[in-house]
Structure formats: C-alpha cells, structure tokens
Amino acid sequence: MSETQIAPLTLNIQYTKDLSFEVPGAPAIYTLLRQAPTVNINLDVQVQRLQDDAHVYEVTLTTRAEATHPAPAESGNGAEGGKDLTVFIADLSYAGVFTLTGIPDNQIEPVLLVECPRLLFPFARNILADVTRDGGFPPVMLGPVDFVGLWQARRAQDDGETIANA
C-alpha cells in the first residue's frame, strides 16, 4: 500500500467567471406576466489549457437562459403583434481550474468535457436559480444535463467538419 495517493482529478478552485442578468422590458414586463415565461436554455463547455508542462486546465460551463412571453394583442404603441417579448436574459460562465494526474491521454478529453462540468454544474444551477429569483421571476431550475451526450455530439460535429474540410 502506498503512503500517498494522488487523486487523478483535482478541482483547485471554482469561481463565477462572468454573470449578467438583464430585464430589458422592466418595469412594464412585470405587469404583463400572468404566468411563468417560456425559458430557453443553452449550455456549452469550453476548455483551456493553462500550463504547457502540466495537465492544468480551466473548464468553463457557460449557461444562457432567455425567457420570453407572448406580446399582448392590443399593444396600441406600434409594437409588432404576435412577436414574443424578452422577459429576461441570464448569462453565466462558471469555471473551475482542474489538475489531471496519471490520466491516459485518450481519457483526458472525456474527463475535461464530462466529469469536470459534472462537478461544476450544481453550483452553476444554484447561481442561475438565485439570480432569476432575485430578479423577481420564478427561479430557473435546470434539470440534469447529459454531459456524455453533449461531448458525443461535439465529437460528431467536429468529425463532420473535418470530413467536410478534407
């Protein structure tokens, strides 16, 4: 039995890299809402290597929540009827600095694009829920995310672009 074992994945630090919350139609939008708005979520993962001589990476989980509500039919102010109004836009980039130790090269990509975002996700979900609630709206509660599926879709897209550029 060895005296010290080094964890293969170490989360050195995690932090809010960028946070933005906008309510472009305030305060009027609050009087129009009679039900929860429709919320569209976009999620992405970016990785940046921080040290050339070591496996130290910044992994950023980027989330954008954009809520819309149907425009009132009798606007009377020249606004386009039928076009959805933007209720709020929340942008969050939540990052962590990870050190990988003893992970085979062929496993680094899935660790960075699947396991690292999995560790960051609960914190990002909580921040997004808090900021939307504090903005006067029902909290946006993100459901579980299939990071394996996102990684596989990214690989398939990258493979398709490689073939198209050949």
Swiss-Prot record:
The keyword Transport applies. The gene is secB. HAMAP family: SecB. This is Protein-export protein SecB. One of the proteins required for the normal export of preproteins out of the cell cytoplasm. It is a molecular chaperone that binds to a subset of precursor proteins, maintaining them in a translocation-competent state. It also specifically binds to its receptor SecA. Belongs to the SecB family. Pfam families: SecB. It comes from Acidiphilium cryptum (strain JF-5). One of its GO terms (molecular function) is unfolded protein binding.
